Structure formats: structure tokens, C-alpha cells
Amino acid sequence: MAGAQPGVHALQLKPVCVSDSLKKGTKFVKWDDDSTIVTPIILRTDPQGFFFYWTDQNKETELLDLSLVKDARCGKHAKAPKDPKLRELLDVGNIGHLEQRMITVVYGPDLVNISHLNLVAFQEEVAKEWTNEVFSLATNLLAQNMSRDAFLEKAYTKLKLQVTPEGRIPLKNIYRLFSADRKRVETALEACSLPSSRNDSIPQEDFTPDVYRVFLNNLCPRPEIDNIFSEFGAKSKPYLTVDQMMDFINLKQRDPRLNEILYPPLKQEQVQVLIEKYEPNSSLAKKGQMSVDGFMRYLSGEENGVVSPEKLDLNEDMSQPLSHYFINSSHNTYLTAGQLAGNSSVEMYRQVLLSGCRCVELDCWKGRTAEEEPVITHGFTMTTEISFKEVIEAIAECAFKTSPFPILLSFENHVDSPKQQAKMAEYCRLIFGDALLMEPLEKYPLESGVPLPSPMDLMYKILVKNKKKSHKSSEGSGKKKLSEQASNTYSDSSSVFEPSSPGAGEADTESDDDDDDDDCKKSSMDEGTAGSEAMATEEMSNLVNYIQPVKFESFEISKKRNKSFEMSSFVETKGLEQLTKSPVEFVEYNKMQLSRIYPKGTRVDSSNYMPQLFWNAGCQMVALNFQTVDLAMQINMGMYEYNGKSGYRLKPEFMRRPDKHFDPFTEGIVDGIVANTLSVKIISGQFLSDKKVGTYVEVDMFGLPVDTRRKAFKTKTSQGNAVNPVWEEEPIVFKKVVLPSLACLRIAAYEEGGKFIGHRILPVQAIRPGYHYICLRNERNQPLTLPAVFVYIEVKDYVPDTYADVIEALSNPIRYVNLMEQRAKQLAALTLEDEEEVKKEADPGETSSEAPSETRTTPAENGVNHTASLAPKPPSQAPHSQPAPGSVKAPAKTEDLIQSVLTEVEAQTIEELKQQKSFVKLQKKHYKEMKDLVKRHHKKTTELIKEHTTKYNEIQNDYLRRRAALEKSAKKDSKKKSEPSSPDHGSSAIEQDLAALDAEMTQKLIDLKDKQQQQLLNLRQEQYYSEKYQKREHIKLLIQKLTDVAEECQNNQLKKLKEICEKEKKELKKKMDKKRQEKITEAKSKDKSQMEEEKTEMIRSYIQEVVQYIKRLEEAQSKRQEKLVEKHNEIRQQILDEKPKLQTELEQEYQDKFKRLPLEILEFVQEAMKGKISEDSNHGSAPPSLASDAAKVNLKSPSSEEIERENPGREFDTPL
């Protein structure tokens, strides 16, 4: 996948797979330098690959977390015992070469503080197998980015491995692991029917994975997940159906930025597979139902990581020039602490390279021993020296263990001995071998204009950056320079231990140290010692090809030279100065050439500047002090964690394309870059601290200056709860992230006193939206097992506020309409509009006469004119007698009781549907689009006319200048003519020249007119094509919108009809009951016996009558509904019928326009030319001869028939 191309990425990362031999265990001998005792052990790895563990003869178990392992070495690279007795003990039996059976496992919390586990195998093959397997497990990218469920399983595995000799789990280990709240642990154990005394232990079989899960649910209850579960459909039922689960995944968890064709939403069968995987109740799973327990498991499962595994994999295009990548770079790689004192270490080169760094620095100085071996140290400081040769060996050993892409060696060469420089070159050639790139590649010669080769072209290659010997200088001057530097640099051997300045750090190899002013002194302090670099010898020069350091002069000079193999280094202060003064030029420079930024010399504590500053300018090698894990280094680790941890990250497109210019200080949206909107809601935390303290979470954003927001959000501090604090606060919204591909989100947790707990740095482009666990990491970017933050993230393409209403209306038209109506009512209540409306209705005549007309005449080119029948009528034009859309009219009372309760329901007409706000909103949007289109073309036309006016003036001025010269010559000739000796043939020649000049001028005007006419014609045709295409699309959208509005309104009307039917039945019963009461009242006037008989008869007949009337009413209601549905269908068909009609009208309109266009353009050009020539004649700037020739310019205009003949079959409906 080195040359990954855009599209669906095929995941190349392999999940953790532990071989059987590692699971079963193997016998080894463990030894330590500090002791002469060797210990036979059985070494194993758990099936999930979480831990390395071993048991000795006393059956005591020790663990080593594989996430702490940095490297595994065997053979000559493994650590060898120094003590001869120890070596003898280890080589018992002489089974095979001891060196080939030795293994060293390197582990530690960071790059500096490392430890070694030294082992000896009994067979060479076993040593190789274990070395390869352990290194593979330790560097597995999926293992470093496990799901929440996997981290909880890791904690469980640790408890299961740390057992007593009897195979029982001590409860003290559980209390130690979950130490934040002892009382909670005790209660959770009791809930699982387990003993709770700290001194007790439990059998392994009693603490199964299911029991462990129940224990966690009691220890850390999750009410917030219950709320999400019920909110998404499980209110009345204790489960989610497969459809509800599908909606949850597709609506909440899916990234809306993804292409739906390449990354389609999940289907039912795919969701069913997930349910079967995570739902513990098999009977529910078979029915496609998911309980809250299964839902919790899904949220913490591997499918629901906050970053897609594809982003961790090598997924970027690695075939572009080297200058198109950010390259993970180290400064003063050999240092383990500060810049002035402390140890230098060969091991730092191994650790830095293993961590993914691809550019390391070597500060080389002349060795002062008898062997004359060059050394690496920080000059003029009290840091220790290390062997240059050992460093080269270390680089060769670890160069390509974690990444196959090229290594760049940045030499700061102070070795003023030609002999020692020759040694350095020889070591590089011999130790690196074929990996050292000695000659440029055939496809990429060192020539101006040729780009750098790609990381893919340079795979498994080592490139040297060192001063290149100048062939212009003589050999003698070179020797003189070397001798001068020798006397200056090492005049006294003790000078190495005397710091020359507080800023004794690196300097750029191109710094100018000849100036003496204050600015240069400050610059020198920042830049450090590299100004005194030695002259490169022939041997070292021969190693340099694609990375030739040169003194930076200016961006203009670099652009003129156009040599991609030349690069410059900038101390951070100089780099910041260039970034501030010339940001766009800096970005342009970095498209073609490499630049290296390094910390200023005054950072004696090895602190770091923020690398984001220079990534924003496209700087490739932003070198940091890897030994200092501050925020800047954490951001750097977060950056290079992705793309297969290859050490290379492809720069954003605008920082690579030569046809685009990018300003890192931009505050607006960049054309061609889709900005994002990001919303983060911190919901809760789990096991954040091992102490009973309050906790809080902070959110930061880093990116372009406009995107960066430090401490953008902070939750409230939880009160003494670090186990399961719930915040449920309002989300923090990053409304506009201008450059998402270079922005990252940082979520960090702290204890109430401000003590750092853990954090996670996530690239905005890689973040998955939805409900996710953020598994925290420590400041060294190593994963923490238990601490996590549960969040809800929304990420989408940014929509400016101008279009927010349109997007809202499109995404949820009903809610939008309701919201608009609600706002209108609220405003009316505040502005007393209701009373005004009442007054207007009381005197309609006055209103109609006084109210100003607000009706706008739609412009001819506005995109709505072509749909005149779709245009809504303004409210002021609507007659007052017209009922509201979907209103119900009550007819006059009749004797028929059914008709008296039956109300008439009218279907909404097309005109009424067009009054709907969502439809009107779309029309306004289309109007704006057409207005913008016409405006753009008008601007082009204006520019073209200006261009032709300028050309006309040029022709005219040239003509006048030449005519004046001829007339002047004619005057001289006339003077000569008056002399007797002058011949008479001169005047006739001048008249011929003037006539020729006039003819030439006329022809130029004709050519100019023809050209102008053709260009204007092309431009206007292009405009008409655009208009026609836009209008055609608008018709489609408007018809679709009107259809949708009709369906929505009609569905609402049918729902409302059901309510009306129920009301009518109640009204009918009410009226019939009233009649019955009247009859009963009449019967009361009769005698008692007759009254009882009539009352009984009335009740019987009343029941029959009610049944009959209800039946008749239902029949009438049914017929009414059928008529309404029929009318609805008719209206929808009318809407659909409008589409071809409008399209036909549009076609005809533009056929007519295209036919008229050539004549219109011709007339326009002729009038313009006439006017111009006439104006010039009035001002005396055009001679009569030229003005008289104006008629020659007016050519005959072609007829429409001629145009058709010249353009047979010409179609004017082709979209742009």
C-alpha cells in the first residue's frame, strides 16, 4: 500500500496473533548484569498478546506489559554479559554459539529510561522466533489502538495471570487495580456473590469473564448509556429492533463526510451480524433485538473505535516528491537531557528511529584520542562524547525496523581533520552498504526544475545531508580554512568543556556569522555552533546528493534557481520571522524544496517549540528534542501516529499543488478546501484516577492560527468521583475548521488539583462521529489501561450561516416550518402585529388602497422567471375571501342532520402549496444563484470590453503618431518644393503613404471589430449555456420540492381529516342526544304510564337511529376522503405535468435567444465602433479620411438561416 491512491482503502494491518509456541511457553535462562546468578524460567505470552510473563522454579509469576516493549534483539545486536564467569554459566553444555542464542527485550516508559530483559534460549531457532514474534506484538498498530472492550479485557487478563501458587486470584490485586473507591469495590464484589475481604482470594473458575462484566457494571454503573438506549427507541421495550439499531448506526455513528457510494450506510443484514456478535442473549439476537447490555458491548467494541483502522494503516500516496511530505525529525538526537550537561547516548538513535523518526542529527567533532576516531557530542558544553562509528552501527541496525521509508542523516560537521572526515565517509559506506544512496537516481538527476524522488522511490535508502565541497575554491584555500578552524576550534583541549554562550545549541548550516550588529549576536545565540562547521572534504561531499544544504538568501532567488535538491535550515526564530513576513512564499518554497526547522539555542532545558507553527507553512523537517515529552512533542507524536507510523505524512493538497496559493494566516474558507464543523460533548469518564478525587476534562484544537483554540472547553469538576463521573454538559462547537487535514483535537483529563491524568490527540479528518470511548494515553503517548472518556462527537462539512436555514429546511422541512411559524407568533406578540392585522381586516378597502405593493417583478435572468407558474403570490395580492391552505369550510345549515355536521374539506391548490415556506426558500436560493451567475458573466463582459477599448486606443495612438510623422515630413517637403532646385515627386509619395496608413488603420479596426464580436458572442453563448443548464436544474429541483411539499401537506391533511371525522361523530351524537332530551321533555307533560311507554320506545328508537346515522355519516366521510385523495392525486399529477411544459418553454426561450444573439452582438459592436470613431472625430483625434471609412467597418450581419447553415445540427442545450 505504499502507493495508496484515493478510494476505498483495503486494510493491510493484521490483528494481533500469538503463535502456539508463545502461548505454550518455552524454557529460557534469565540473567542480569548486576548479578552472577542465572535463573531458569518458562516464558509465555497470554493468548491476546497483552503480557509477557514468566514463572521461575518457585512458581512466582512476573509480568511485562508488551505495550512498554520498544525492541527485541538477538544475536550480535543482543546485550552480551561482560563478566566471564556469567558468560561461562550461560554457555553450559556448549549447545550452540552463545551469541546466536541470546535475546534482549528493551522496554521502558519513554525513550530515555529504558531497561533490558536478558534471556538465553536453548536453540538458535527459538531465539530468532521469539525475537521476531515479540517485536511484531510490541509494534502492532492495532494493539496500540485497541477498543475499550480490549482494554477492560487486558485488566482482566492481568488479574488472571497474577495468581497465587494455588492458582487463586488475590482480592488485594483487585483492590489495587480499582483503588479509587474501596467501598465501591467491596459492594461490587458482594453483588457478584464473591468474598470482599482484602486478604481473601477467589478461585479462577469463579471469576469468569461474565462475572467480571457484572462486577464492572456494579462498580461503574452507566446511567448515561441507559438514557441513550431509551432515547433511541427502547422506551416501552427493553430492546432495540434491528431497524432502530440500523438507524442509530447510520444516523449517529456514520461519518456524513464519506461518499455514500464508496462507503454505503449499513443494511439490515449487516446490522444483524453486529447484533449477533454483541448481544449476549442468543434468543434476542436471533429475533434481531439488542438489549442494553449488548448495546454497551457494541459501543465498547472494535467496530466503534473513534479512529478508523484505515487511518492507522499506510493509507496515503507515497509516490509524490519528498518535499510533499512532513517528515518526523529529531534535533540533537544523541542527548538524553538538557543541552549543556548530561549524557549522550548511542541508544537514543535506536529508540528515536524505532519510534518512527526518519531524520536524525549527528553533531560530529574531531576525536582527540590516539586512534583519532571522530565523536558525536554537543560542542562547547559539558555533555559526554559517544563514538561516531557506534552511532552509524546503531542507525544501520534500526533504520528500517518500523518503517521502510528513507532515513535522512543531518550532519553538523565540525571535524576539521581531513583524515577523520575520510574515516566518517568510510564508516558510512561500509556499515550502511547498499542502503546508502551514493548516486542520484536516473529518473531524478540533480538538475534545475527536476523534483525530488518520492519516499517510495527511496525505500530502504539512507540519505546524507552535509555541506557539499565547493569545486570553485582552490585546494590551497581549502587547506587554509581547515587549518584556521583547527587552531580556532581546538586551540585548547579544555575549551570543549567551556560553554561559549547560553545558546550553545545547533545553528543552521547556512548561517552568516560575519555580521557584528546586535541582531546578528542575538541570531548567533539562537543558532548556536554550526556557524563554525568545517569545510567538507571530497569523501564526505561524495555522500551528498538530494539534500544539499545552502545558505538561504530569499524566496525569489530560490525560485529562480529552482533546484529541489538544495535545502535550507532555519532556527525557529528565523523560521517564525519568514513565516510572519512571507507566509505564502514560504509555503510555495516548501512545495519544491526541503526546509528544516530546529529549536533555538537558548532552549538549554531541551524544551520544544510548537511544531504546528511550521507545519502550517509546509515545512517538512520540523526537528524536536525527542527526550523532552512536553505538549509540543505530544502533538508531534499525535501527528506521526497515523499513516502506518511510517514517519511520513502527506501534506494537504494546497501545500503541494503548484497552481494553488495558500496563506496559512487565512481566516476565511479556502476555495477548494471543504471546511468542517466539529462538535464534542463530554458525557462521562471511567476509572480516570486511582485516587478518590474530583476530575475534569479539557478540550483543545490545534491547526491553522484561525483553527487553534487552546483550552476551548473545560467541564465542571466532579465531586470526589473518579470512577464514573457524568457531566452531560453542553457540547463545545468548533463552528469552522478551515483546514481539517492539518487540525487535531486534544481531549485531556486532569485531577482537581491540575495533575495530568491522560489525553488523546485525534486528527480532525480521522475522527469518527457518534458515541465513542476515548481511551486515554499518558504524556509519552502510551495507552493507559483503564482511564477513558465517553463522548458524543458530531463532525460534518461546514455550512456558512448564510445557508444554514436552507440546509435546515432541506434536512427537516416540517420542523423548520413549525419553527418559523412559532417565531412569527412570538414576534407578533412583541410587536403588536395582531392588533394591526385586526384593524386591516376591519377596513379592507382602506388597506388595499393604502398598503404599498411589495410585489417584485422577477428579473429576466434570475432562475425563477422560467417557472412563472411556480412563483408564489405575495400575501398582499391574495384575496381576503380565500381560505387558508387546507382549511375546512362549514356549509349552510340544512334539515339533514348528516349534512349539518359534515364539513367540507378542500384539497390545497397548487398556488396554496407554492406559498409554503420551504418552497419559497428554495425559490429565493435559486434567484440568488442565477443573480450570481449573471453577475459573474457581466463581469467577464465588462473586462472584455475594457480590453478592447485599450486595444482600440493603442491602434488609434499608433495611427496618430505615424500620421503626424508623415504630415511633418510633408511640410518639410513642401518647403523644399518652394525651392527651385527641389523635384516635385515627393508630395505624391507622402500622399500614398497617408492613404496606405489609413487603409492599414481601417483594416485593423475591422479585425478588432471581428475579434471583439466573436469573443463577445462566445462569452454570451457561454452565459446562455450556463443559464439554461442552471434553469433546467432549478426546474427539476422546484418540481421535486413542490411534489414533496404536496405529499407532506396532503398527508397532514389526511391526518387532520381523521380528527375531523371523530369530531363530527361526537357532534352528531351531541345533536341527536339534544333531540332525544327534547322528546323526553315533551313526554313529561303526559301521564305517567304513557310517559314510561314512550320513554322506552324513544330509547330503543334512539339506539337504532344513532347506529343508522353513524353508518350514514361514515359512508359520507368515506366518500369525502375518496374525493379528497382523488383530488390530491390530480394535483400531484398537475405538478408533474408542469415539468415537461416548463422545460419545453425553456428550450424555446433559449433557441430564440441563441438565434437573436449574433445580430444583437453585431449591432452592439457596430454602435460601439461608430460611437468611438464619431467621438474621436468630434475631438479631432481622428482624421476625416478615417471617419469616412467608418462605413467599411459595418459589415453585413448574417441572417439566422446563414447561422444555421454554418452550424448544422448545433445544439444549445449542452451543459457547461
From Swiss-Prot:
Keywords: Calcium, Cytoplasm, Hydrolase, Lipid degradation, Lipid metabolism, Lipoprotein, Membrane, Nucleus, Palmitate, Phosphoprotein, Transducer
Principal EC category: hydrolase
EC code: 3.1.4.11
Domain C2 stretches: 656-786
Biased composition regions of type Low complexity, renumbered to the chain: 491-501
Catalytic residues, chain numbering: 331, 378
Catalytic activity: a 1,2-diacyl-sn-glycero-3-phospho-(1D-myo-inositol-4,5-bisphosphate) + H2O = 1D-myo-inositol 1,4,5-trisphosphate + a 1,2-diacyl-sn-glycerol + H(+); a 1,2-diacyl-sn-glycero-3-phospho-(1D-myo-inositol) + H2O = 1D-myo-inositol 1-phosphate + a 1,2-diacyl-sn-glycerol + H(+)
Domain of life: Eukaryota
Modified residues (Phosphothreonine): 509
Sequence positions bearing Phosphoserine: 236, 417, 511, 582, 887, 978, 987, 1197, 1199-1200
Major localisation: nucleus
Post-translational modifications: Palmitoylated. Palmitoylation at Cys-17 by ZDHHC21 regulates the signaling activity of PLCB1 and the function of the endothelial barrier. Palmitoylation by ZDHHC21 is stimulated by inflammation.
Pfam families: PH_14, PI-PLC-X, PI-PLC-Y, PLC-beta_C, PLCB1-4-like_EFh
UniProt biased composition (Basic and acidic residues): 472-483, 967-979, 1075-1095, 1205-1216
InterPro entries per record: C2_dom (IPR000008), C2_domain_sf (IPR035892), EF-hand-dom_pair (IPR011992), PI-PLC_fam (IPR001192), PLC-beta (IPR016280), PLC-beta1_EF (IPR028400), PLC-beta_C (IPR014815), PLC-beta_C_sf (IPR042531)
Additional remarks: The receptor-mediated activation of PLC-beta-1 is mediated by two G-protein alpha subunits, alpha-Q and alpha-11.
Primary role: Catalyzes the hydrolysis of 1-phosphatidylinositol 4,5-bisphosphate into diacylglycerol (DAG) and inositol 1,4,5-trisphosphate (IP3) and mediates intracellular signaling downstream of G protein-coupled receptors. Regulates the function of the endothelial barrier.
Known partners and oligomeric status: Interacts with DGKQ.
Name assigned to this protein: 1-phosphatidylinositol 4,5-bisphosphate phosphodiesterase beta-1
Lineage, uppermost ranks: Eukaryota, Metazoa, Chordata, Craniata, Vertebrata
Originating gene: Plcb1
